[in-house]
Each structure stands twice: as C-alpha cells, then as structure tokens.
Amino acid sequence: MLLKSTTRHIRIFTAEIEGNELQPSDTVLTLDVDPDNEFNWNEEALQKVYRQFDDLVESYAGQELSEYNLRRIGSELEVLLRQMLQAGEISYNLNCRVLNYSMGVPQAVV
C-alpha cells in the first residue's frame, strides 16, 4: 500500500520510481524536495536535506511505517528548510509560478 506525507516543500512516498510512475514499496522511501520550485537550490543544499532525511529515516528504524511517522519526518525537514532559508543557504526563486513567501517575507540586512 502506498503511504505518503505531503507538506508545502517536502513529499515522501513509500514507493520506488519506475519510469515516470510510483510503484508502492515496503522497503523504499522516495523524497521529493520543493516540487513547486519555490527555492533556488545548489547541490550542497540539496545534499544537506538528503543527509538529514537519511538520518531521520534511520532514527525511525524499527518503528511502524505509518503516515504519522512519515509526517513527522516531513515536518522536521520543513524546519530544516526554514533554517536554511534564514541562513542564506537557499533563497526564494523569484521566477517561481507563484510568489507567496511561504516561509516568511525575505529579510534585508541593514
């Protein structure tokens, strides 16, 4: 059975990607970061999110694979994205389809 957690910027599925389709899996989690391209990313920032995801998944090892636990992981990754935005590691994509500043209005350093 396919389980999923969807937040504004993080989507987690209990599935593998085969072609362009998600195939349910009991052993694989698939992470989709910023599916709406709201942020500008570099490889280092993406790797930081992936490492945190791996650490969180490992910390839940042995626990039930449930939508609740997937939501907890997704929520913790959202917190990381906010911290990265505030630290300047990522920035808003001004060419995004919709500018809604979901993590807060950009701050100018004076």
From Swiss-Prot:
It is an enzyme of class 7 (translocase). GO terms for cellular component: plasma membrane-derived thylakoid membrane. It catalyses: a plastoquinone + NADH + (n+1) H(+)(in) = a plastoquinol + NAD(+) + n H(+)(out); a plastoquinone + NADPH + (n+1) H(+)(in) = a plastoquinol + NADP(+) + n H(+)(out). GO terms for molecular function: oxidoreductase activity, acting on NAD(P)H, quinone or similar compound as acceptor; quinone binding. NDH-1 shuttles electrons from an unknown electron donor, via FMN and iron-sulfur (Fe-S) centers, to quinones in the respiratory and/or the photosynthetic chain. The immediate electron acceptor for the enzyme in this species is believed to be plastoquinone. Couples the redox reaction to proton translocation, and thus conserves the redox energy in a proton gradient. Cyanobacterial NDH-1 also plays a role in inorganic carbon-concentration. Belongs to the complex I NdhM subunit family. This is NAD(P)H-quinone oxidoreductase subunit M. The gene is ndhM.
